[in-house]
Amino acid sequence: MFRVNSIARQLGSFKSASKLSQQTRKMHVKPVKMRWLTGGVNYSYLLSTEDKTKSWLIDPAEPAEVFSALKTEELMSVEAVVNTHHHYDHSGGNGAVVSRLTELENADVQVISGSHNSPGTTQIPKHLQEYALGDLKIRCIRTPCHTQDSVCYYVSDPMSQEKAIFTGDTLFIAGCGRFFEGTGEEMDVALNRRILDGVGNSNWATTKVYPGHEYTKSNVKFVRHAVYKTAGENAALDKLEKFCNENDVTAGVFTLQDELEYNPFMRLDDPTVRDAVKDPQGSLTRAQVTDRLRTLKNKM
């Protein structure tokens, strides 16, 4: 009897320790502000494992600002420079960053991007291709529209259950990117099929969004002006608006589920959104609604 109870206590202790480990361990996301003094309000991100020995450096477009923000040991942990798309304000720093990492003996550093239009690209992932970064699982979700080589990176930590998605200029908080190389139909597919399906509906509420720019205040202003015009009409937007009034950084605060509740580009069948694009009868296609929303946003 003593032996059985002893074993039971040991098993209980093991389960408690395991649960505590899941609660205390975490993946790390370090946002790096770039071009904030010149109006670009870009983000680069250092995504790291729990022990910070392995990292991805996402969209390090401005090397001087990135090097200033990161410690030498953080740079030495970088296994890959990763781009969400080829625009210079996301991939323009690839060469200088790789050179610096090579000086730090990161001889095998890779450059992962959606096409060879990003300087120094060594790997081009296919849609839904997966990578491992230590214990982290990373799924590449190709989202052509803003550019045809746009890729979002969905990250999950199976130990802590933390989840994040790095969306570049495809999905912003309460908005989306311009359709420079695509159509409204492609953006609808990117946001409402590829991202949502790639993450999976059971994970939407726990997946934090890390966009390529801090455009949230501008996006909220548009949604309030053009769609949900009065407080109380959309509680999720009210909450986001209040947060924006009190904070400058929204990256990593809101989830995909939040986006589904206030982002008009992800609420194309909402009668209020239809009214905003002068389609009260709901006769327009989703692609047409997306195009009209983007046209309205571009005019602000």
Language model regions located:
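Charged helix-capping and loop-helix junction motifs
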Residues: 182-191
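Conserved beta-strand hairpin/beta-sheet module of binuclear metal-dependent hydrolase folds
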Residues: 23-76, 153-167
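Active-site-flanking alpha-helical
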Residues: 92-93, 97, 152-153, 176, ...
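Divalent metal-coordination and catalytic microenvironments
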Residues: 47, 59, 85, 97, ...
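Active-site HxH/HxHxD metal-binding segment of metal-dependent hydrolases
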Residues: 55, 62-142, 156, 161-163
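Active-site metal-binding loops of divalent metal-dependent hydrolases
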Residues: 60-62, 86, 116-117, 145-147, ...
